[in-house]
Amino acid sequence: MKLPRNILVIYRLAVRGCAAMAICLVLAGAAAASPIDNEKTRNKALKALRAGDFEKAEKIYRDLLAKDEKDLDSRLGLSHALLKERRLQDSFDHAARAIASDPLSAQAHALLGSVVLATGDFHLSVEEFRTALSLNPDQAMAIAGLAMIDFYENRTGACVAGLRRAISIDPDEPDYFFDLGQAAARLKRYKEAADAYERFLVIAPRTDENRRARLLGWIDFLRYLGQQGDLYSLGGAERSVLPFDAVDYRPIIKVRINGGKELRFVLDTGSGMSVLSEETARKVGVRAVARGGYALAVGGGGRFEIVYGYLTSIDVGEVHIENVPVYIRHFYEEREPVDGYLGISALGRLITTVDYGARRLTLNRQRSSERADLATVINRPGKNDNSAPTEARPGVEVPMRTTSSGFLSGEVAIEGIQRPLNFIFDTGATTTVLSEKLAALDEAQGFIQKGRMRVVGAAGIAENVKMALLPKLAVGTYTRQNIDAAVLDLEPVNETSGFQQSGILGGNFLRYFRVVFDFQRGIVRLEPLESSTVLNENAPRPEATTPRR
């Protein structure tokens, strides 16, 4: 409901008056306990926070609070430092205490919103950001927070506008420039993205050399992309149907890159950008065009060098995709070797249907003038299309968010866990994954099994990985019982995802469905298969393979 302008003015004056009164009361009560030296000490803490020395800032703020627990500015500073350290529970506690002390603190509400957004609670974060803006319409952290919600929920244009406004209010906060770089890159505004990242490097702390090296390599790659043609330009058929293998529950298709011979690629919705193996890159003559830093990942040493390449084209069935950026890295697969992974960005303009029962992949070109009916789009004919129609099935459409890293995240429910959880929907993962943090909760202890498993990750092989058995795993209105899951540290994923992921929905769950991906609208449709099309549940479980970050 929109209030009349005169009522809004009265409301804002009342809020400002209450805020002024609250500030006077706080100052009057704390004057004796807040000497001038405390202000100098807080400035030192703020300087440490800006310099990226979060531990030093935390210590200073804790010392100040030990002297005066009613020091609101120090409590807000401590919450902010803990947020930067990704100690989300502690950060939440101090932001909540600040609100209890001063309910009219816009900064406290903005901080609380930022913390709960990082945990993946979108509904509460929106409430807190809006409360902050009702108290102070120019609260930059709240403006940036709402902009990032737009980013995750695929309203990227609105995100860019919000971040630009936040930067105009607080041009010294490096995170806003970093986020703007991400949003601009998603909109294919590569020059603006590179400029934003370069500004971030100017004002950001120099404490994390690997992150700076990653960004310098990414900026070089963005500059390179800005000189190329339209990325992911589509040609060929409007609709293409092709078979896939699924020996380990991952859809493995045959593609051609740069017009060459057929190669084996995994269809990987757990990767934003496509990936090419080092060996295949050498064979087909694809060279690095930029590189820099190391990416954190599962397995081995926990990281791998970031190397960027560029493909003139990829042919998937009768669909032709031109100008495709890729990562180039070493692959560790032993039992089911592949040449690459086809990521979300390459498929972004295609409605992609993965039928695990028929082992058939259907690609339909997205028509910008329509909102596709995902229940029938699989049978929409293309020109000269003689393929047999597919049986219509009931299903449920699940809204997706897109993480900062570019992969799909949806809400799932696990019996015994009281809150909804954010899971990555990943066709490139053999098995479902439960994060170590979630597995450590008291209510999850009954899930843990005695057995161990071997996991192949982007950074190598992890041995003796804990296993869990999820009693009931639900997505939308559909539930599967007794789903095996690997228990893995997902912090490498969460450091770059923007909001917390509690697990990965892998092939051992998705194989029970026909799955339709509408990447542009951020929707996944799940259609349960008939029992006759479900793979044998008593078959040997394959080696687990996790997403290629």
Can you describe what each PLM-predicted range is?
Residues 1-13:
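N-terminal secretory signal peptides that target proteins for export/translocation
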Residues 14-28:
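Bacterial N-terminal signal peptides
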Residues 33-39, 43, 55-59, 63, ...:
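Pepsin/retropepsin-fold aspartyl endopeptidases
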Residues 49:
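Polysaccharide-binding and catalytic clefts of secreted carbohydrate-active enzymes
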Residues 66:
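Rossmann-like dinucleotide/flavin-binding elements
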